């Protein structure tokens, strides 16, 4: 597909990398010459120096021939103007990044009077991810698939847990329809077989329906989150407070900027807003941070978030949620040492790639959706079986799948099946697959040759 991007910031850079890896023709429009040269030198893309909301620049980029136009600058209005122009000039699909709460209300998004194909708000997506984690505090991460029929959660196994040394084959006997679809052990990702056992310090990725996953989550026996401290009153905090407004969670916010603290006090009069440096040890202790069920560290500085979370973990906070925008930092730190890491940039890129893959595969294959897990090392894919093929009408145990592939769920006529080796695929099924293999786009890519 021919894809035009406007804006070479963090999201734009990461998106260029993903699009090039999937063999798309990418053209980047960027006003900063140094940024443009850096990205063009890193990836096999075309670059144009200029304003993406300028008609002449869009004409130079042949926007009328592009399949998908994506506006990702730091300015919402520029993104919207650029996308409206691109659509008028002939772009088939338009995606915009919009971050301002004024443009993220339900009316604006649902009515979509400007006709965008997709509106992406990284901070709102991150807030929703944090809310999911607060709902399931024992989990490191929570994902939902197949219209939220299927949940996938990540847990750390401790030596004191009853899960330690449990064979994978025993999980269904003990917990019902749950499947361990991946294990991270000693920094390696494994798609487990039934005879493997779970070990101390394993990070396990478990999938099941909502009810079974709630029961599995509660097996860990930690208390629900009834109190939450938020450090840093930015956009993510704003959206998170809106999501949690009816939750009865006792919430406090610490913000260093007096004007922002005052704004939050006006917007959320029932909350306790503290003006101060929430990354300072004395203020954290003064505000009794150690007694909160969960702390979300959401300042604009990744390093401060990481160091603050390390301190909070040391003083006994059970659930630390840490915002990290620079994924390069995740390669330096020991991520398993952190309770839950939220990366808005990655969430936004995954959302956009999900959309793009859906458009590509509507034309060329039966892949409907994809999600990344474990910092991109695991892909969860959803296929639609449109017609009888060599994978249908035979037990799953007889399918010769490639190494690193696991069938996690089957959606059939609105019902979710968490399969055993005796289940069979049927025409019309939607198939949820977990894999370590990159660039899987067709269902036959799952089969060993």
Regions found by a protein language model. Give the residues of each.
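Cytosolic regulatory regions of ion transport systems
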Residues: 1-449
């Amino acid at each position: 597909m021919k894809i035009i991007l406007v804006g070479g910031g963090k999201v734009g850079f990461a998106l260029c990398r993903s699009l090039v890896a999937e063999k798309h023709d990418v053209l980047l429009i960027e006003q900063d010459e140094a940024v443009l040269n850096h990205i063009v030198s890193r990836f096999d893309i075309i670059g144009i120096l200029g304003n993406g909301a300028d008609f002449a620049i869009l004409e130079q980029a042949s926007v009328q021939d592009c399949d998908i136009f994506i506006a990702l600058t730091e300015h919402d209005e520029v993104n919207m103007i650029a996308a409206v122009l691109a659509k008028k000039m002939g772009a088939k699909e338009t995606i915009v990044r919009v971050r301002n709460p004024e443009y993220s209300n339900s009316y604006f998004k649902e009515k979509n009077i400007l006709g965008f194909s997709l509106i992406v708000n990284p901070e709102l997506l991150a807030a929703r991810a944090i809310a999911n984690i607060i709902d399931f505090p024992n989990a490191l991460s929570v994902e939902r698939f197949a219209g939220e029929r299927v949940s996938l959660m990540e847990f750390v196994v401790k030596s004191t847990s009853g899960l330690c040394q449990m064979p994978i084959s025993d999980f269904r006997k003990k917990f019902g329809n749950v499947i361990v679809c991946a294990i991270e052990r000693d920094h390696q990702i494994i798609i487990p077989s039934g005879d493997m056992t779970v070990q101390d310090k394993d990070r396990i990725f478990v999938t099941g329906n909502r009810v079974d996953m709630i029961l599995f989550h509660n097996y860990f026996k930690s208390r629900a989150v009834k109190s939450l401290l938020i450090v840093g009153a930015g956009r993510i905090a704003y959206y998170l407070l809106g999501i949690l407004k009816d939750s009865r969670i006792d919430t406090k916010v610490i913000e260093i900027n007096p004007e922002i603290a005052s704004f939050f006090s006006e917007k959320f009069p029932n909350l306790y807003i503290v003006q101060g440096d929430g990354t300072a040890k004395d203020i954290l202790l003064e505000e009794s941070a150690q007694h909160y069920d969960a702390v979300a560290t959401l300042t604009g500085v990744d390093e401060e978030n990481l160091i603050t979370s390390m301190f909070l973990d040391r003083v006994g906070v059970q659930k630390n949620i840490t915002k990290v925008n620079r994924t390069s930092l995740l390669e330096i730190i020991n991520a398993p040492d952190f309770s839950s890491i939220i990366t808005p940039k990655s969430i936004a890129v995954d959302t956009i790639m999900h959309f793009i893959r859906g458009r590509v595969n509507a034309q060329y294959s039966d892949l409907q959706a994809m999600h990344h897990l474990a910092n991109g090392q695991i892909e969860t894919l959803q296929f639609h079986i449109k017609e009888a093929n060599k994978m249908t009408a035979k037990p799953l145990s007889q399918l010769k799948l490639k190494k690193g592939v696991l069938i996690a769920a089957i959606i059939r006529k609105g019902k979710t099946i968490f399969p055993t080796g005796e289940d069979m695929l049927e025409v019309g099924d939607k198939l949820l697959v977990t894999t370590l293999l990159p660039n899987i786009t067709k269902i036959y890519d799952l089969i060993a040759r």
